[in-house]
Structure formats: C-alpha cells, structure tokens
Design a protein with these regions (language model features):
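His/Asp/Glu-enriched, well-ordered alpha-helical/loop segment
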Residues: 123-141, 157-169, 174-221
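Catalytic cores of large soluble enzymes that bind and process phosphate-bearing ligands
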Residues: 39-42, 144-148, 201-208
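Glycine-rich, flexible loop/turn motifs
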Residues: 30, 35, 105-109, 183, ...
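Conserved beta-strand segments that form the floor/walls of ligand-binding pockets within enzyme
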Residues: 20, 105, 195
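Divalent-metal coordination cores built from histidine and acidic residues
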Residues: 1-56
C-alpha cells in the first residue's frame, strides 16, 4: 500500500496527500475491532526499512505500551512523521513519557482507550484524562453522532479547543452509500454505524466529513 501511495502521489494533481498507517504495533486488548490478537514488537529493522523506501507516510498510529513503541515514536518524529497514540490503555505517567518520546496526537479520542476507572478500591485516571492534562497534545474525534455523545463532543471542544481538535471520519469503504453493506460477516451496519457482529464494539463510521462538521456545529458548538 505504501509503494502504491508513493506512485499515486507522483501523478499531476494527485488527490492523495500522504499515507496514514494504523498498526500493527497496537495493544491487542484494545484493538479487537481491528482483529489484532498478538503483541507486535515495534521492530526498528522493519519500520526503518519501510520509511527508507517510501516518503509518503505522514502519520503512524501505535500503542505506547507496546515493546519498542517509544523508540519508534522518536524515530518517526526525527523523520518528520506524526506519531499518534491509539488503541491504548496507558495512564498519566506513561502518557507523559509517550508525549516526550514524540506521541503528540491522540487518534479517535475516547474510542479504544479508557477513561477514569477503578482497580479494587482505588481510582485512577485513564488515557483520556491524561491526554486532557497535557495541554499541547492534539486530539481527533469521530463526530458522527454515534461514536461519541454530544456531551463528550462539547467537553473535548471546551478543554482542547478548536486549535487542538480535529475531526476524523474513521469511515468504512461503504461510507456515503445509500444502502451501506459489508461483505465481512464479522461486521454489521446498524444504527448508522459499523459494529462488530457480536455488538461488543464499534468498528468505524459510515459518515462523510460534512456529517461530522454538521454534528459538531449542532451538538458541540
């Protein structure tokens, strides 16, 4: 895919501005919707070889807690590639370390990451609160009206502001279709969103960018 993207970007007036990679260095516990079942160590030989071969990669998402992920983020940053934390369950100290290593953005904020929680009788901040506490960190939200309720969209807008919040569709290939359908039997389209067939998780939106802008203006503005 990276090689194909590289070639497409060479074409005159190419609509492709760059490649965004999500995975494979993701926490399996938090990446069920991507069907990642094993721990994938961020192998310098593998990611350096790819980044030396192509120049189209603009962003790469990973879970900071995966083996080798912090060095991975440092390398991405040195290469001018945005390192984004995703599908993670890290708490404040680890988020601080991740930010220092180069993870300056949070992918599909609130989704595939925990918020405030308890372990036995004690309470702990989640990834969400940790990202809020690091002021320079940017976030993106899937504002399709399904992935996050209006109250959370308003909270993100209030705490991160317009300069540090962006919208992302995180959409499936059938987005925008009059009758969206998928061939993968593990997935279903229901209530205007894509879900795992067992209803244990959302998988992605079927919204277009204008839908997201409309939702933010009407519900979070």
């Amino acid at each position: 895919a990276a090689v194909v993207c590289e070639e497409v970007m060479k074409e005159p007036n190419s609509p492709v501005l760059g490649l965004h990679i999500e995975g494979p260095y993701l926490n399996p516990k938090m990446a069920r919707s991507l069907f990642i079942e094993q721990v994938n160590t961020a192998d310098p030989a593998a990611y350096r070889a790819l980044l030396e071969r192509v120049s189209c990669i603009r962003r790469w998402d990973a879970s900071p807690e995966m083996p080798g992920a912090l060095d991975f983020a440092r390398y991405l940053t040195a290469q001018g590639v945005l390192a984004s934390l995703s599908h993670t369950e890290v708490e404040y100290e680890d988020v601080k370390a991740a930010y220092a290593a180069g993870f300056t953005h949070a992918a599909h904020f609130y989704n595939a990451m925990p918020g405030f929680h308890k372990r036995r009788e004690y309470k702990y901040e989640g990834t969400v609160e940790s990202v809020f506490l690091i002021d320079p960190m940017t976030v993106e939200v899937i504002a399709d009206g399904r992935h996050l309720p209006a109250t959370i969209l308003r909270l993100v807008y209030k705490l991160k502001g317009v300069e540090r919040t962006c919208l992302v569709t995180d959409c499936m290939p059938c987005a925008g279709c009059a009758n969206p359908q998928l061939d993968d039997l593990r997935l279903i389209i229901e209530d205007g969103v894509c879900k795992l067939a067992d209803h244990s998780s959302l998988v992605g939106s079927i919204a277009m960018m204008d839908d997201l802008v409309r939702t933010m203006v009407q519900q979070a503005g």
